[in-house]
Amino acid sequence: MKNWIFIFMISMITLPGYGKVKVQKPKMKHPTAFAILVDEVTYEKIPGAIEAYRDAIEKDGLSAYIVSGNWESPDQVRKEIVALSRRKPVLEGIVLVGDIPVAMIRNAQHLTTAFKMDEEAFPFIESSVPSDRFYDDLHLTFDFIRRDSVHPDYFYYKLREDSPQQLQPALYSGRIKYPEAKGEDKYKAIAEYLYKVVREKQETNELDCFTSFTGNAYNSECLLAWMDERLALEENFPLAWKNSRTAKFLNFRMADYMKFHLFDELQRDELDVMLFHEHGAPDQQYICEGPAPVGMNGYVKGIKAAIYNEVRKEVRKGKGTPEEIQDYFIQEYDLEKHFFDDLYHPELLKADSIANANTGIVLEDLKQMNTYPRFVMFDACYNGSFHLPGYVAGYYIFNDGKTIVAQGNSRNVLQDRWTIEMIGLLSQGIRVGQWNRLIATLEGHIIGDPTFRFSVAVPHTLALDIVKNPADRQLWEKYSRSAIPDVQSLAWRMLADQDERHELSPRLLKLFRESPCNSVRMEALKLLSRYANDDFVEAIRLGLYDAYELIRRNAAAYAGKCGDPRLIGDVVRVWLNTPESERVNDVLQSALYLFPVEKVTEELKTLQKSATTVTPFALRQRQIGEMIGKLTDKKQNRWLDYAEIPKATLSLKKQISMIRYIRNLSLIHI
């Protein structure tokens, strides 16, 4: 009885906070801690759900704080997180529940994978990045700019020039924010979601069932890129390969309107993980383009529909009157006036509307559906735009299904990013938030409970070692010999993080040469990029010929970033001889611009005369000739301009503009 009274009293103690902030100490003692940060109104409305969530987290092995307040700025929230991070036990993660201020980050586009927008030319709300790295990457420093006058929960910050310029979050984080466009009582919805999390934490559920889907126009629609994902996921999710329903790979080509097949997948109770590789918007997942044309009439109708859609789109944008837009297309494509007779025919508009609706998953679809994959990854632009009233990822967790957590992006994201890096750690019981921390980007966020994890048959201490023993070299050397590929990858990452003397690269090159595991070789290549030495150059050269398409693609990107002339011959030959690897070829073509023009041109001319290429002679001649023309044309090869940066003839403004462009450039972000 005395012990119960003591625990109750401890749970009611509040620590000094900022303003009206209240900090409830954990009820249970564990080696690491977690913080639930919630706005005052949400906590007052649903205290039972918040506390039940706290209790479930503590039963799952984390001491959990509840921090509630009338949050007036992100700085106020961050101050509380910093204070908790200095306490014991060590804080490993946080979750932001309800209406927590949104930090809109500027001067940091080099930390994004793809988002590049002129911050001087475009409005703040468009050219800033909504990012919770403000809350979990505490070594970054910012200057406050201002609060948004229309959206009072948006606060603009500039990454300081003297701040660290790389992401290294010490904590993991998640957002539990109801998408108010859904139209229900948000406090009731948050409470129901939290009780769903509590129920799911009571289940024993190993990761043994997943589906991966690739949409149209993703990765240049390269079939090799799609096929080779299996090489990695066989290593990542070893328990899933039981039958045809537990490990699925779907592609937009498999049906005229794949969204309906995906609806079936999303409502499978046994599905643990759903991976979406697609293009996206805040309110839509782009799945396919509809049925392919059949016969001559089909192609004619397809062309007509495409032109009609473009005309209507231009009119909606206010680019001109319908007549003006039609006149432009008539002249551009040599059309007859009567071509547009049916442009606004009611039946045609209705048919087009239905067809367009069937090509993507929209919020209205999700509003009527319960989703069941416990974890959903949106490898897509904008699906994780938590700062908006309606966003795709939010609709996936706020329903009566069993989806607990999603990963999504608040801005656009690079297709070539290694999105499934170390995802196999989820099979080993690592928390979803911890995995996301290891692959952090400025725009990538966890939507939902970041403490969620799958069960493991044999308990181990890996999750605890990540937090408590990151610098124990002997321990990570032991893990590097694990039979589990992504545990090996994590171990080598930890060893590289401690390699202050830069002595590890020969071992990493040996690992890259000898490992039979695709994921491990890819991690070795990525880690070697830190060293930028001869070992790295050799790994790039070997990587251009690797069996795993993703390694070839990233080796191509690294070749351009590295720019070592020794790679020119291999880059040119692979570019010319492997047209079937469409995405690799795209990256290689971009990389060619980053080498000395005269040396690339010389190599191309040598191959032009050679018979040792697989492409037909005439095609090879034309392809090489066009490439030489692009490389030597200043209008097409802007890198010829950037060679002028050190010269005093350029104005300071021009130099700064060029430097900013190069800093922000992501030929590829891995």
What role is predicted for each listed range?
Residues 75-256, 263-273, 282-296:
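Structured catalytic cores of large enzymes
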Residues 127-193, 305-418:
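Catalytic cores of nucleophile-dependent amide-cleaving enzymes
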Residues 469-478, 500-512, 533-544, 564-576, ...:
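Amphipathic alpha-helical scaffolding segments comprising HEAT/armadillo-like alpha-solenoid repeats
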Residues 483-484, 516-517, 547-548, 579-581, ...:
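Short inter-helical turns and helix N-cap capping residues of alpha-solenoid HEAT/ARM repeat scaffolds
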Residues 464-465, 488-500, 519-531, 552-564, ...:
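Structural detector for internal amphipathic alpha-helices that build alpha-solenoid repeat scaffolds
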Residues 669-670:
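Conserved small/polar residues in nucleotide/adenosyl-binding loops
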Residues 419-502, 518-523:
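Caspase-like cysteine protease fold
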Residues 8-18:
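Hydrophobic h-region of N-terminal signal peptides that target proteins for export
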